[in-house]
A protein has these predicted regions:
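Cytosol/matrix-facing juxtamembrane amphipathic
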Residues: 2-50, 101-166
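Small-residue-rich hydrophobic membrane-insertion segments
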Residues: 49-126
Length: 166
């Protein structure tokens, strides 16, 4: 069974580097989940989410490299879910899963949303604190069990904190 590999990044640049590296490993932006606070999205992605620039950069090539385009595109287009009241923005497969469940985790707050996304409660509490302080959580479901360890090491090497596979 494939495993969800997650890591918490303190900066947009570090999160972008992680998304770029995951894509270079053969994953697509549709395989990558991004979670951040609404405040972080507003601060870090205000320009991209208000325009079609992110989508155009992905389609048009490598404007400034894959990283800027890919992370911005994940947060600006595709499956995205905003959980009002708890200020969480979720994009990617985790958003699709929560939307399919009627976003049941929203009633339990941020930790409930993370647990609903498949993250154990004790880890969700750690990620909750990181997201509230401006962190960006990147998650990717490994295509195979043997790839999970490689993804875990990759995220750690790129500066992620609290890297885990579930």
């Amino acid at each position: 069974m494939a495993k969800l590999v997650t890591g918490l990044f303190k900066t947009r640049a570090a999160a972008e580097a992680a998304v770029d590296a995951i894509i270079k490993r053969g994953y697509t932006r549709d395989d990558i989940s991004v979670l951040m606070s609404d405040a972080t999205k507003s601060k870090e992605f205000a320009i991209e989410s208000g325009t079609r620039a992110a989508q155009g950069a992905v389609v048009g090539g490598t404007v400034g490299g894959v990283t800027v385009a890919a992370l911005a595109a994940i947060t600006a287009v595709g499956t995205s879910l905003v959980l009002p009241g708890i200020g969480l923005v979720i994009a990617g497969p985790i958003a699709a899963a929560l939307a399919g469940l009627g976003a049941g985790g929203a009633t339990g707050g941020l930790i409930g949303a993370l647990v609903g996304a498949g993250i154990p409660e004790h880890r969700a509490k750690v990620y909750d604190a990181g997201l509230r302080s401006g962190g960006i959580l990147i998650g990717v479901e490994a295509k195979a069990d043997e790839d999970a360890g490689k993804l875990e090491q990759l995220l750690a090497d790129l500066g992620a904190e609290h890297v885990r596979q579930e």
